[in-house]
From Swiss-Prot:
One GO CC term, this protein: ribonucleoprotein complex
Alphabetical list of Gene3D superfamilies matching this protein: 3.30.70.330
Keyword annotations of the record: Ribonucleoprotein, Ribosomal protein, RNA-binding, rRNA-binding
Originating species: Herpetosiphon aurantiacus (strain ATCC 23779 / DSM 785 / 114-95)
Keyword Ribonucleoprotein: yes
Name of the molecule in the record: Large ribosomal subunit protein uL23
Transmembrane regions listed in the UniProt entry: none
Annotated family: Belongs to the universal ribosomal protein uL23 family.
InterPro entries reported for this sequence: Nucleotide-bd_a/b_plait_sf, Ribosomal_uL23-like, Ribosomal_uL23/eL15/eS24_sf, Ribosomal_uL23_CS
Function, in words: One of the early assembly proteins it binds 23S rRNA. One of the proteins that surrounds the polypeptide exit tunnel on the outside of the ribosome. Forms the main docking site for trigger factor binding to the ribosome.
Gene encoding the protein: rplW
UniProt xrefs under SUPFAM superfamilies: Ribosomal proteins S24e, L23 and L15e
Domain of life: Bacteria
Length: 98
């Protein structure tokens, strides 16, 4: 699996912005990726030293849409989140402007 296939996109929220001060960065990752794969991908793409990787599966939410024909329900997609802790003194430059 390619490193760019593992890291899908960064997750930017108010809470994650506060975590960046502690050297923790959040990414949406491929569901079949494991912690060693995520660590290697972040080190390859951003050229930083990774101290730890925490992962969690985010379950899709129920979505209900009201139409002329009644209600239609479905789920948003499930996805995997990874919180990557960098070694002390390390930073990812693209996040510094946020």
């Amino acid at each position: 699996m390619n490193a760019h296939d593992i890291i899908i996109r960064p997750v930017i929220t108010e809470k994650n912005t506060a975590l960046m001060e502690e050297g923790k960065y959040t990414f949406e990752v491929a569901q079949e990726a494991n912690k060693p794969m995520i660590k290697a991908a972040v080190q390859q793409i951003f050229n930083v030293n990774v101290k730890a990787v925490n992962t969690m599966n985010v379950k899709g939410k129920l979505k209900v849409r009201r139409t002329r024909n009644g209600q239609q329900s479905g789920y948003s997609r499930s996805w995997k989140k990874a919180i990557v802790t960098l070694a002390p003194g390390e930073r990812i430059e693209i996040f510094e402007d946020l």
